[in-house]
């Protein structure tokens, strides 16, 4: 297990863990393992929040399968236009809501799916669209977690 984590650290920005087969013990186990500062074993909110794990605050960055390119494989998306329109509509809704309450949009991308030529154009088009809006931050989840911990640590429960 530790060798696997070391190799993953060499190749990735951050450690990963299962989000799909999580058990009631997963959050405690990743908090104990060390090297993690958050988890995404949650689909219940638009913003990060803190929970208690063994009497310590733990950051949860909620995730969304709605805007994940895996929908090409599992059904729900047929064309790259479908993916772009869904991402754009989701962004537009959250951006409007974000005028009064902050929002976070997760977009799950996989090299083997959105790395394909036609699908990569949808991602490029979406990023171009989003970049035209003020007050939008496109960031990897680790940067969001670090920002949240720095700016909202006083809200830990």
Regions found by a protein language model. Give the residues of each.
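C-terminal domain-boundary segment and adjacent tail
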Residues: 38, 88-157
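Active-site-adjacent pocket scaffolds in enzyme catalytic domains
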Residues: 14-101
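Single conserved hydrophobic/aromatic residue that forms the stacking wall/gate
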Residues: 1-13
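Short, conserved active-site loop motifs that form the nucleotide-linked donor/cofactor pocket
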Residues: 9, 58, 136
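Flexible, glycine- and charge-enriched loops at secondary-structure boundaries
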Residues: 2, 77-80, 84, 116, ...
């Amino acid at each position: 297990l530790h060798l696997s984590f070391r190799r993953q650290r060499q190749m990735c920005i951050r450690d990963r863990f299962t989000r799909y087969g999580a058990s009631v013990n997963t959050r405690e186990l990743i908090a104990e393992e060390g090297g993690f500062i958050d988890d995404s074993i949650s689909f219940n909110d638009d913003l990060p929040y803190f929970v208690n794990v063994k009497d310590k605050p733990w950051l949860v960055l909620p995730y969304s399968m709605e805007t994940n390119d895996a929908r090409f494989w599992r059904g729900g998306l047929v064309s790259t236009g479908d993916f772009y329109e869904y991402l754009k509509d989701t962004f537009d809704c959250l951006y409007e809501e974000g005028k009064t309450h902050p929002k976070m949009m997760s977009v799950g991308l996989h090299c083997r799916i959105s790395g394909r030529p036609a699908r990569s154009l949808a991602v490029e088009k979406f990023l171009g669209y989003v970049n035209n809006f003020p007050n939008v931050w496109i960031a990897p989840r680790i940067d969001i977690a670090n920002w949240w911990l720095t700016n909202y640590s006083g809200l830990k429960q």
